[in-house]
Amino acid sequence: MSYHFSKTKRFILFIIGLTVAGIGVALSTRPGLGTSPITSLPYVTTFKIPWTLGIATIVINLFFILAQFIILKRRFGWKHIAQLPTLLAFGFFIDFGMWLTKFYIPGSYFLRITEEVIGCLFLAVGIGFQLVANISLMPGDGFIRVVSEEYHIPFGTVKICFDSAIVISAIIFSLCCFHNITGVREGTVIAAFLVGYFIKLQQKTIRKVKMLLLI
């Protein structure tokens, strides 16, 4: 079944999705147990470079847009360029989420794990809203799709390789700068599994949201 709803509703839902996802990144980062795989490299750089997590995310994801341009060349179009404002907005909402959550830092390990899980849930819900809106992709997902389509590799396979490469890059950066592993911990592994799991759980909810948008 195809769904057709106004661009205004889609845009509003998309912004809500970016906001919720940004807060999810902040919630999964604040406990200090690591963060989601795609955010692990930007997060580790913040321990070395005096910039915010949002800015680090923007800078590093710009390379994924550049990589798409290199692969596609003349076929690089507006739908790929649209990833730039999406990235800028997401970076802003990550920093907004970090500001919003700075007032509460969990003390016990149980509370830190709990906040990590809640952050994964927020991130999954935010991604779900973005999928419903279907306006633009984040540069990382855009890069994965381009590689999948151009080289005829299943999207899921490319996603696993991409996330693994980001985490490995974060570990290498950490070892080179700090001579130990910083910023990549059990929370990174938890996020790698839980975000995808929560997205699968909310498939029925996503369909209901689509139906509501038709009203």
Give the positions of each predicted feature:
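Core subunits and conserved enzymes of cellular information-processing
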Residues: 1-215
